[in-house]
Amino acid sequence: MLCLTRLRANVNKVAFMEMVKDLRFRTEAPIAECGAALKETHGDVEKAMEVLRKKGAARAMKKRSRVTEHGSVVACVGGLFGAAVITVCSETDFAARSAQFQNTCARVKVALQRKIIDSKGDVLTNPTEAHRSLVEATAEDIRSSIAVLGENVTIKSVESLRLAPHVAEHISIGSYTHGSLDVPDVGRIAGVVAVSRLDPTKEVQASTLTDVARHFVASSGAEGNYAHQNFFGTEETVGQWLKRHGLCFSSSLVVDFGKEPITHTASQPRNAVKHPEG
């Protein structure tokens, strides 16, 4: 009889641990909290998930005032409609390098991409409004990340790529991220670039756009006219390289985490005709 009782106890323990494992997989909450939530709800996994969600939201509210000085920048390209760089912050570098944080950044990028495409780029005309809208759209995801990481996570800013008005047709947009931890478009430095196709019937290879964005990331601290710089890894100037690839530069945006954005915009041609007003 005693052996049978012990056997049942062991079976119940194994079943309980399986439920804890399942709950942790579904919520990413700490094991101890999963166990406590299951005991509180008498083994009801769905109710336990709700308990963990409420506790996570409560902790998130308490942590929102904490200073966030670490994090990543995220390159976000919304098809042909525009691009931006998002800055997402955490309290510690340890959290910023975690898979949870990095994957949260990737989901934030997808949320902004949808907004760019759905609005045909209009959302980027006002970066402050774009930031507010993105924070609102990802609030639940950010709260979940705070609950898992145990520290504050914030979307600090959205910087928009602005096209040169006189080079705004037949545009292709590319991006490059430096210092990535295996999550695409998330890293320490992110750059987005817009170029115009000299022959609108020809498409630009994705690798070519990446090369252009990589150049501006690599030379973001350089002084002088970008067109006269050597293109990254070549003996050609930027202007020569772009011309050989049938491209005309419009604009670039590079954000190094924690630093001011660096932008370049194509200069207005000196011989451009100015039409009198009125």
From Swiss-Prot:
Presence of keyword Mitochondrion: yes
Record-level GO cellular component terms: mitochondrion
UniProt keyword annotations, A-Z: Elongation factor, Mitochondrion, Protein biosynthesis
Primary localisation category: mitochondrion
GO biological process, one term: mitochondrial translational elongation
Compartments it resides in: Mitochondrion
InterPro entries associated with the record: EF-Ts_dimer_sf (IPR036402), Transl_elong_EFTs/EF1B (IPR001816), Transl_elong_EFTs/EF1B_dimer (IPR014039), UBA-like_sf (IPR009060)
Superkingdom per UniProt: Eukaryota
GO molecular function: translation elongation factor activity
Coiled-coil regions listed in the entry: none
Family: Belongs to the EF-Ts family.
Biological function: Associates with the EF-Tu.GDP complex and induces the exchange of GDP to GTP. It remains bound to the aminoacyl-tRNA.EF-Tu.GTP complex up to the GTP hydrolysis stage on the ribosome.
Other facts noted in the record for this chain: This protein may be expected to contain an N-terminal transit peptide but none has been predicted.
PANTHER family (UniProt xref): ELONGATION FACTOR TS, ELONGATION FACTOR TS, MITOCHONDRIAL
HAMAP family: EF_Ts
Official protein name in the record: Elongation factor Ts 1, mitochondrial
